[in-house]
Amino acid sequence: MPVFIATGFPSPRIHTYSHCYTLEMAIQLGNSPARRNVELKAKLPSLETTRSLVQPLATTRLDDQHQVDIYFCAPQGRLKLRTINKQATQLIWYSRPDSSTSKTSHYVIARIDDPEGVQSALTGALGIRCRVDKHREIYLCDNVRVHLDTVAHLGDFLEFEAVLEPEMAPVTGHRQIAVLRQALSITDADLIQGAYVDLLEAAGAAAAQPPLPPISPQ
């Protein structure tokens, strides 16, 4: 996904929701609007089988990533601080329907130079919801990203992300994903709704995770 740098932060408004504080803050992104993609997520019966099917279709194979996402309580959409390979850190906000069918997602990504400070500020203002730890294989089929994810406490998953240019209609992404889904033999029974954080909470795995130390990229 493209990366945008947050350039200004107006005064926040803090509200209390249930057990955590939530922060309402508009992020000024200069001339860069939120981007869009079309997404679909599925549980994989066999990671090896799916890998063997996607490799011949991929136009590019990117380096694998170890991603640790810390989700914060947010009044709208989902907000997470992501560390990639213990090096780069991004703050990601996104909003999408919780549907098992392909859906359009709006998202913003900001590079973070002070991850410890940002994590501390967001923890104090919002409260931590959950941590998601995963290994991700990344394949590109033109503008569609195919992620093969092994998620701690959950298992193996596939995620399609059809990245939409400003002039592209969402229907284009839906059609691209439908073609790839058929090629990879993804059935209706494999499809899931929500995000990994929702699955962890539903499984009760989030409560079993150890306390979260500050992020320290190495």
Regions inferred by a protein language model and the residue ranges of each:
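Conserved, surface-exposed functional patches that form binding/active-site neighborhoods
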Residues: 128, 132-166, 170
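Mixed-charge, glycine-accented linear interaction segment located at domain edges/termini
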Residues: 168-192
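N-terminal strand-loop-strand beta-hairpin
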Residues: 21-144, 184-218
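Intrinsic disorder/low-complexity segments
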Residues: 5-6
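Intrinsically disordered, low-complexity terminal segments enriched in Ser/Thr
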Residues: 14-22
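Residues forming well-ordered secondary-structure scaffolds
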Residues: 35, 117, 134, 155, ...
